[in-house]
Amino acid sequence: MGCVASTGNYENEDDPFIQNKRANDLIEQNLQQERNKNKNEVKLLLLGAGESGKSTVLKQMKLLHQGGFTHRERMQYGQVIWADAIESMRTLILQAGKLGIELDSDLKNAHSGQLVNTELHQCKEKIFRANTLDQIDARMAGGSEFLNEYVLKYNGIGSKKKRQTTLGFKESNGADPEEEDETDAFLSEKLAGTSYTGSSETSELKRIDQSTNEEIAYAIKKLWTQDKGIRQCFNRSSEFQLEGSASYYFDNIEKFARVDYVCDDMDILKGRIKTTGITENSFKIGPSTFKVYDAGGQRSERRKWIHCFEGITAVVFVIAISEYDQMLFEDERVNRMHESIVLLDTLLNSRWFANTPFILFLNKVDIFQEKVKRSPIRTWFPNYPGKLGDSETGLKYFESLFLSLNRSNKPIYVHRTCATDTQSMRFVLGAVTDLVIQQNLKKSGIL
């Protein structure tokens, strides 16, 4: 009997109807497995213009849900911050000349013509001569590919060429790159007290300086704490491009000077490595798996992601609310806040995100609250009704402006954030987590 039954089953397997049924059953089984998987999988798209702080939001998620950063990552950030600190001080010295700010390190006695403070002047020269590439220890940084790419911006080419390399296209503001480089060379030599020869190759400043990290750190600290012109220039940093955490670097410069220094959490939150392309990060939060896609915010990066995402649970859009008076790194003719408004308008009303809820982070609120005391919002937004120093009215004004861009019925949730503040971000990210899990359950048909 067993043999007969076996033969019958074998013959049935050749029946096209049975084969089709089994194929359909297998497809349905796979679909059900995918549905079960998707109901616990949350996809977040992290977007925003360049310098908005979205990568800092991602760092907070790593701290809260992934156990933080590896030893290698902490070493890498130490190298990056050290290089940025040197470049930031060099930027302040150069920009002081362009803005007509007199530095204490350049003051001379009216009668003798001698420098009033020789030590300060030597500190300034030391910063100019420091070769940033020489300050990077690839071994201590782990020799990582991302770090090697990062330090390419310190290869000595002009600022215009740096931007062109970053963006992949030339700026069309009428400026001549060679002329701009000549201007920088002139300023460099003038500030250093040497005569301008017209050739940066023979410039005194092009000598490779072999100063130790401790000597360079001392020079930075001396200029930061004792040269009033440097502070005055820093207070006008919205008029040029300066690393957002420069003051933090300067205040802590001695620890970053140590080649074996291991960055703590706050150092990493303050440090910055530009996001290029799209990175995917996974976090296990309760029964759910969060997949967070962090996309580069500079203009040249956006075409890589603006149409690439389907099935996104929610979009987290980060806006640096404090940058209402600053210009883009990649195009110094365009206001950063204006750029964020245009970008948000495009995304909110894009067919790719027609039914996707948005979560807005009004980021860098702490900086905004201080900045509005000295930089009028009305200069850039003439319709702003508030007074100088009224941060609450300013926040409400921008929040209303962003919400008015929504021409659909999609939900928008707004949070005021300081992405470097772990305690406040713990609360905000907790609320966001609960929200997107609820949205995902609705999307899966469970709620």
Curated annotation (Swiss-Prot):
Residues 290-299 are annotated as: G3 motif. The keyword Metal-binding applies. One of its GO terms (molecular function) is G protein-coupled receptor binding. Mg(2+) binds at residues 55, 275. GO terms for biological process: G protein-coupled receptor signaling pathway; pheromone-dependent signal transduction involved in conjugation with cellular fusion. GO terms for cellular component: cytoplasm; heterotrimeric G-protein complex. This is Guanine nucleotide-binding protein alpha-1 subunit. Belongs to the G-alpha family. A lipid is attached at residue 2 (N-myristoyl glycine). Keywords: GTP-binding, Hydrolase, Lipoprotein, Magnesium, Metal-binding, Myristate, Nucleotide-binding, Palmitate, Pheromone response, Transducer. Its cofactor is Mg(2+). Residues 359-366 are annotated as: G4 motif. The keyword Nucleus does not apply. Residues 417-422 are annotated as: G5 motif.
